[in-house]
Design a protein with these regions (language model features):
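Catalytic alpha/beta active-site cores
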Residues: 1-233, 240-247, 253
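Short, internal active-site loops enriched in acidic
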Residues: 223-227, 258-263
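Aromatic-lined carbohydrate-recognition surfaces of secreted/lumenal glycan-active proteins
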Residues: 252-258
Length: 338
């Protein structure tokens, strides 16, 4: 059903396909009734691997996302499929957030060092993890880029990984990983900005084999900001970090979490405060409701979590985030996370 919806045939259905091959730079599908057909939109087929008469992979583009139809005769799934299809690999998450935040990833200096080490491994392309499953040792590595042959005979390549963002902490937190001359913990958001950006120079300066950004950018999500003044502070912090690391202005891109009341009601002003950097906005149910609880705590008993999700104000909050993002020109240029 998916193939019939994403890449429909001129006639017939992919369910009745017996074979796929490339003839004269076009995909030809032979059906079980002996007829041959092609794609209703031929431009959706962009390349392949293997032999033209018997490809091992077919690469398609649909709604600006890619997917690969794979053929492997040794696979049990392929052996039960008339055309020998073994799997379909989908390009799904466009972006992935690596988290340095206190609530989920790092609560002290030791945790923070681990988070930085993982971010370093991701930017160097060397991160791996070995674990035991079903009595066997298994190792997970970062996915390599996917190479394929374009229809004109030239080489094509698809990213094997989604675009990585790194979430720093908000402005309030401090951390004992670094102490100042008076033995005070340093502001954790400043520490995160400097160290995660420094680590990201492996990618910016192309000192790695698995590239994250194709444009030499670093993508940082800033959470828990209360209004445009705090966004402006983050923007100035990014200016200072770029100067410290000798990075071109606006190398550090900003994702703004719309999860505090003053940000929600001033979202346009928040976006304006980082207008040269902003690449992402998103909502956050727990932080946003938490701010509402702290703001209105004396007004009476709050609704329970499950009931809050059904309230009109939560729907209005989510809708407003999308509406403001679109009104500010995000379509086709920046991400509205949902």
């Amino acid at each position: 059903d998916f193939l019939d919806q994403a890449i429909p045939l001129i006639v017939g259905s992919h369910q009745n396909a017996q074979s796929y091959q490339i003839l004269d730079n076009a995909l030809v599908i032979k059906l079980d009734n002996g007829d041959s057909t092609g794609l209703a939109e031929s431009a959706s087929f962009i390349g392949f691997n293997g032999e033209a008469a018997k490809p091992s992979e077919l690469v398609f583009k649909h709604n600006d996302l890619h997917f690969i139809v794979q053929f492997d005769a040794s696979n049990p799934i392929a052996q039960s499929d008339m055309a020998g299809i073994s799997d379909i690999a989908m390009e799904s998450a466009l972006t992935t957030i690596m988290d340095c935040e206190d609530s989920v990833a790092a609560v002290d200096a030791e945790d923070k060092i681990i988070a930085y080490q993982n971010w370093l491994g991701l930017n160097q392309g060397t991160l791996s993890e070995t674990f035991e499953k079903s009595g066997k040792q298994q190792t997970r590595l970062m996915h390599q880029d996917k190479n394929y042959q374009k229809l004109d005979g030239t080489a094509g390549k698809l990213k094997g990984r989604s675009l990585m963002f790194v979430r720093n902490v908000g402005h309030l937190m401090t951390n004992n990983a670094i102490l100042d001359q008076h033995n005070n913990e340093v502001p954790e958001g400043i520490m995160d900005a400097v160290i995660t950006s420094l680590i990201s120079t492996y990618d910016v300066n192309q000192h790695n084999t698995l590239r994250n950004s194709d444009t030499g950018s670093v993508y940082i999500v800033k959470p828990k900001m209360h209004g445009p003044e705090e966004v402006a502070f983050a923007n100035e912090l990014f200016d200072r970090v770029e100067e410290l690391l000798s990075l071109p202005r606006n190398t550090l891109k900003m994702g703004i979490m719309d999860e505090e009341r003053r940000t929600s009601v001033n979202l346009k002003a928040c976006i304006y405060a980082a207008k040269e950097r902003v690449v992402f906005i998103n909502t956050g149910f727990l932080d946003r409701t938490g701010d509402e609880i702290h703001t209105s705590m004396s007004a009476g008993v709050m609704a329970r979590k499950a009931d809050i999700k059904l309230t009109k104000w939560i729907s209005a909050y989510e809708d407003n985030n999308v509406d403001i993002g679109l009104a500010c020109g995000f379509s086709g240029k920046a991400q509205i996370g949902k």
